[in-house]
Structures are given as C-alpha cells and as structure tokens.
Amino acid sequence: MKFTALPFEVGPVHFVGIGGIGMSGIAEVMLNLGYKVQGSDIKANPNVERLTGLGATVAIGHKAANVDGAGAIVVSSAIKPDNPELVAARAAKIPVVRRAEMLAELMRLKFAVAVGGTHGKTTTTSLVAVLMDAAGVDPTVINGGIISAYGSNAKVGLGDWMAVEADESDGSFLKLRSTVAIVTNIDPEHMEHYGTFDVLRQAFFQFVENLPFYGFAVLCTDHPEVQSLASRVEDRRVITYGQNPQADARLENLKMDPSGATFDVRFRLRGQDETVWRDIFLPMMGEHNVLNAVAALATARELGLTEAGAKTALGQFGGVKRRFTRTGEWKGAAIIDDYGHHPVEIAAVLKAARQAATGKVIAVMQPHRYSRLHDLFDDFSTCFNDADSVLVTPVYTAGEDPIEGADQAHLVESLRSHGHRDAGATTRDAVAADVAKRAGEGDVVVCLGAGDITLWAYALPGELEALG
C-alpha cells in the first residue's frame, strides 16, 4: 500500500504557521514523500529549521505575497480569518485545506491508529509509534511532540500503518478515519469550541463510532467518562485498559523508583487465552505515563508485538520533548520542563515529581490563555497539592484579551485561600532568584505550561549557576 492518491501535480503546498507542532509534522511527511512544500511563520524555531533543511521554503512573517504560486494552502484553527495569506488565497481561489483535512488525506491511504483524549495524547502516540516499530510494522508517524528516538515529531515509514495524534480542540478530529481509536481520558476542555461538556462527550463517541467494522477502540476505563463511553459503544470492538479489575488489559504490580516504573499487564481478551507480561520497565515517572504505555501495549499487541519486543522498546524509550524533560540541575535540584497546562495534567505531573523527589517539589506555573484560567479557575486553585511551593507567572495570552478575575494575582490569592502555604507571583526576571530561595538537594523544580515557559526551563539552570 503506497501513498498515491494525492497527486504531486497539486503544486506547492503552503502551510500557514508551518513551525507549529501540529503543522510541521504533516509538512515533514509530505516533504519526505516528495511533495513540494513551502510555508510561513511569525518567527523561526527548531521545527522551521528542520523543515528548511529538508527542502521546504519558509518565509518569516505572514504576507499575501507568500502564497503566490501555491497550489493549496493548509491552515489550522489558530489562523484567524483576517490572516493576509488566507485572505489572499481565497481571493485568488487557491484551495484552502484545514490541517485535519490534510492529515485525513494522508491517513486515508494507510491503516491508522489515532490517539485521542484530553490529556496524554502526545506521549501515547509516541509509545504507540515505538512499539509498532518493535512489532516490525514500520509506521508513518505524525505526533504533537518531538519523539526523542526520531529527533522529530514525524517520520515516514515503509509499512502500511500510521500512528497519529488526534487533536480534539476544534472538533476537526472527527474528519480523521482511523482503524484504531485510543481514548485516554475525557475532561472539560476547549469549551470555547464545544460550548458544553455533553457536546464534547458526543464528539468522542463519534470519534469511536467512525471506526470501520474491522477496527477497534482502546479505552481507559479507569476514567469514569471513558468508562461511560465504552458502555455506549455497541457496534465496534472495544479493548479496555487500566487498573480497573474488569479491564481487558489490566495494569498490575506497579512499582516506582527515581529511574522509572516497573509493572505487569494482564491481558484477558475475548477468544484469547489469559496472558501476563511481567516486569515491564518504563523509564518515565508517573502513573499517568504507565497507563499511556498500557494503551500502547494493548494496541501494538494486536499488530503482532511480542512480550520481548515490548520490554526492549519500552526499556529504551527516550521520552517526548516537553513531557517531564530534565533541562539541568542546580545544587542537587533537578529542573524539569513539562507541557502540562490543564489542572488534571498539572496534578498528574506534580504527583510524578513527588515520586521522583527526595526533597521538595517546586512548581513554576505559566497559565495558558485567560479563557482556560477563567473556565477552570477552581480546578487550578486546587491542583497544586503535591507542590511544596508554587510560583505563578503572568498569563501567556496566546492572543486573548484579559478576563476580569482570571490573572496571575487572582490565582495566587486563590491558591493561598485554598490553604497553600507557599504560593507567590514571579516574573521572567525574578524567577531564578525566587527558585534559588527555595531549591536545594533532592528537590524537583517543574516548569509547567504550554507557552514560552519552556524557554525559562532551559535557561534556569544557567541563571541559577550565575547566582552562585
């Protein structure tokens, strides 16, 4: 089975915002398949540099002239209707393709595993990819994060399968037609698009219902919303996973130490003999990451993965950039960068940090979007219980206007009123000094957020050293 349906004659494909983590993966796959790819972004970044090295032409800044000669332009939901390139393309009658539509076009030509869920998609997609490799499947991969084993968020494989991250944020994941659908969890998020939690629930149900009759869903029944979803699926095969005693792939005997997790998985699938894969090691912290690994194991086992192959692949798993990534240390304190920006994610990451630390856990948290902070304010006020100290930065606006009561000062005040003993405000200039007052041997400092706090996390070890 080969990529043949999308004609090369379509002309240069122009990606607006080509450096974004979602767009860059599709662009990289298309480049490696031989398509002519160009694009633009507001600034250069490692994704832009990687794509340029592969042959893409990338303009810095958005200008109408950038789309001259393009055969089609690809946009994500982050691109506003008044973007000059989008306006120019429509005026010139150049086809405009949504990101998910282009991803669906690539998926249409392969069997595909699509990983959905409010949290854990990127790590789970990465784990699925490396386990599919271990099963000899050689998948094409398009992910929402940099997979350490690939040095990229994408790769073209020679096999018949794909592993992709299915982004539910704007509902466009329903355009994807996969063979396998994984759902890790379902929490209230992206309400600016869905309006109500019931609409989001229905979207995930439709995501599973879109499977062909020969496909299957892999659903985490440790999560009440996903367990409810599983009960509604009547016409498609379902494999459940989790610590739930009723799960088809049950996590057992989980043990954690600072090097990672060791665990067993008991498989009890209809029509198969019960089997147990024992003493699997995953060099990642956190129960949430182990559950992601169980989802990947349950999926790849259906594609031919053996127990020995699973142990080798997971034991060598290098992780995903911005998922509990160590950026350095200072006086025995580890500095961690993590993408967690939703209260559920933050709580899971801090629980993992608590397991890794022999001392204190210090959270440096950059709220991402006023709307998210506003909609989930009470949850943000109570998700830092595993942190001894919380330093809150100004909100990363992502282009949003301020919302009354949803800002740095109000969050700090709310954390204190909810009983947190050491919650305070910090800034880019003050963060090193604020951390230095608190951090020491055996501590873990976790920089959390989906904005530019990742730059803070990588600069922090050097800035702390400069303080002495």
From Swiss-Prot:
Pathway: Cell wall biogenesis; peptidoglycan biosynthesis. GO terms for molecular function: ATP binding; UDP-N-acetylmuramate-L-alanine ligase activity. InterPro entries: Mur-like_cat_sf (IPR036565), Mur_ligase_C (IPR004101), Mur_ligase_C_dom_sf (IPR036615), Mur_ligase_cen (IPR013221), Mur_ligase_N (IPR000713), MurCDEF_pg_biosynth (IPR050061), UDP-N-AcMur_Ala_ligase_MurC (IPR005758). Pfam families: Mur_ligase (PF01225), Mur_ligase_C (PF02875), Mur_ligase_M (PF08245). Keywords: ATP-binding, Cell cycle, Cell division, Cell shape, Cell wall biogenesis/degradation, Cytoplasm, Ligase, Nucleotide-binding, Peptidoglycan synthesis. One of its GO terms (biological process) is cell division. GO terms for cellular component: cytoplasm. It comes from the Bacteria. ATP binds at residues 117-123. Its EC number is 6.3.2.8. Belongs to the MurCDEF family. HAMAP family: MurC. Cell wall formation. This is UDP-N-acetylmuramate--L-alanine ligase. The gene is murC.
